[in-house]
Amino acid sequence: MDHTRDPCPWVILNDFGGAFAMGAIGGTIWHGIKGFRNSPYGERRIGAITAIKMRAPALGGNFGVWGGLFSTFDCAIKGLRNHKEDPWNSILAGFFTGGALAVRGGYKAARNGAIGCAVLLAVIEGVGIGFQKMLAGATKLEAPAPPPSNEKVLA
């Protein structure tokens, strides 16, 4: 069991805040550029600021909800699996998160959202494992050369 991480309630809050910040910052950049480009020539700065104020907080909230739900499901799955740490936790948490976020759209939307999110998390986990194995192979230590033998000295 990993004792270096915070307990699950704090991990959930931390992940929610981090996801909200990522969404708000990304939304500021995205909607700022979009508002700037779609405004008339003399009002581009005002158009960018207006677009940021209208849309960036909503995008931050959407990212925050996703991060909070994912972290909640991840902690719940770890608890159900006796605190086992492996990629299946993230894949299952992604499955439940995608399904929960799409459940208002009906059964098919929930199913497709769950499968899509699980596949996305499986790809992310697979790439992470691949990079770990690739980088671990580059750091293997070579055995040192044996010391010279003393046969000539004894003869």
Curated annotation (Swiss-Prot):
Gene Ontology biological process terms from the UniProt entry: mitochondrial genome maintenance; protein import into mitochondrial matrix
Disulfide bonds: 8-75
Membrane-spanning ranges: 10-30, 57-74, 87-107, 112-132
Membrane topology reported for the UniProt record: Multi-pass membrane protein
Keyword NADP: no
Keyword Cell wall biogenesis/degradation recorded: no
GO cellular component, one term: TIM23 mitochondrial import inner membrane translocase complex
Family: Belongs to the Tim17/Tim22/Tim23 family.
General function of this protein: Essential component of the TIM23 complex, a complex that mediates the translocation of transit peptide-containing proteins across the mitochondrial inner membrane.
Name used for this protein in its record: Mitochondrial import inner membrane translocase subunit tim17
Species of origin: Neurospora crassa (strain ATCC 24698 / 74-OR23-1A / CBS 708.71 / DSM 1257 / FGSC 987)
Lineage of producing organism: Eukaryota, Fungi, Dikarya, Ascomycota, Pezizomycotina
Gene name in the database record: tim17
